Amino acid sequence: MTTEIMQISLSHNPADARWGEKALISTNDQGVTIHLTSHDQLGGIQRAARKIDGQGIKQVKLAGEGWGLEQSWAFWQGFRGPKGQRSVVWAELPANEKTELEQRLKIIDWVRDTINAPAEDLGPEQLAKNAIDLLCAVSCDAVSYRITKGEDLREQNYAGIYTVGRGSDRAPVLLALDYNPTGNPDAPVMACLVGKGITFDSGGYSLKQSAFMDSMKSDMGGAATLTGALALAAARGLKERVKLYLCCADNMVSGNAFKLGDIIRYRNGKTVEIMNTDAEGRLVLADGLIDASEQNAPLIIDAATLTGAAKTALGNDYHALFSFDDELAQALLNSAHSEHELFWRLPLAEFHRSQLPSNFAELNNVAGGAYSAGASTAAAFLSHFVKNYQQGWLHIDCSATYRKSAVDQWSAGATGLGVRTVANLLLAQAKQ
């Protein structure tokens, strides 16, 4: 691996034919040139950065014209990897763009590092504390919080988080964080964010195969994404009150783990029969959504690596979006477009809410055998815990959070996708 700094420049001209038809990069004695000849120029820069990293080049300088904020960020998204050190000498940017780049590097890299962390190093309580540390590093004066853990969850009737997490030696945790930059303790809450923080998911007694378990350190991706989104919105100047709920637990097998046929009784009166212990994310989110609904905020967003069905539909390129609120769903899609992130809305209809039949409880935690729209029925399950589910609620199934192996645009591991979109939406809602 070379230790010299490699100069990287941009060109809108095609590479010399000797580099091959439609070559993305070429080299000369001045360094590496990225040739932007396709309509997706940011994607081209990101793919080129992966190629450069793959050649063992770890120290670079972005030189010449064309390196704006988005071009610089696209390069870093592709250049960054989960192991080894990399350094970039950034091109000169206007002060506001430089600040934005620095905030993204701090916050979105935190999200990626947190999701990539081994489960052994990141339990439920550590995830909650790390989230607090990030938000305090951005705007500590505006942050207050409460951590509820272990038996206290049972005593306070957080039945979902407690039930899922009780099978682990590491106690389950609910983080309730209040971002209130107004200084007024009676200020209305503009938005509530509810994140799934399963720090390892074995599947419980509905045990996963190794091929499906090996990436389950990333099952807290929703919690990390929403933490990063709130931090980035705060860094961008969010002046409205937002509450963050992280529902954190391990889903493990033990003599104390929950079992098929168990019934969970939630604080809102709903009862849920467990027919699959590997459908645990919705069980912990339900507690957070009940709390969020009690705030009467006009906006509730939950995010979770919830279903394999969403990945089957969209792969790892798009996050799946569900909502009964067409206007709000479009607002998020507009934010995603502004931030160059990919979201796709999947169906969620009133009839999905009745596709969770149980013989012994009001709801089943998985859909009946006749209903195969797994991502939609998972979203429908969550809607039963949102007081006004038809308006002001968005569910994000984080299918683009993590990649088990590298592709031409991304290294293996976490992507950080979704952070910018949710931050953008929070700021847009604050202006209304």
Swiss-Prot record:
Keyword Hydrolase appears in the UniProt entry: yes
Protein name, per record: Peptidase B
Quaternary structure, from the entry: Homohexamer.
Main location: cytoplasm
NCBIfam families recorded: PRK05015.1 (NF003450)
PROSITE patterns: CYTOSOL_AP
UniProt gene name: pepB
Cellular location(s): Cytoplasm
Cofactor: binding details: Binds 2 manganese ions per subunit.
Any one biological process term the GO annotation gives: proteolysis
Function: Probably plays an important role in intracellular peptide degradation.
Active site: K208, R282
Gene Ontology CC annotation, any one: cytoplasm
EC number(s) given by UniProt: 3.4.11.23
Annotated positions binding Mn(2+) 1: D201, D278, E280
Catalyzed chemical reaction(s): Release of an N-terminal amino acid, Xaa, from a peptide or arylamide. Xaa is preferably Glu or Asp but may be other amino acids, including Leu, Met, His, Cys and Gln
Keyword Cytoplasm carried by entry: yes
GO MF, one example: manganese ion binding
Entry keyword set: Aminopeptidase, Cytoplasm, Hydrolase, Manganese, Metal-binding, Protease
Family: Belongs to the peptidase M17 family.
Cofactor list: Mn(2+)
Protein residues bound to Mn(2+) 2: K196, D201, D219, E280
Top-level taxon of origin: Bacteria
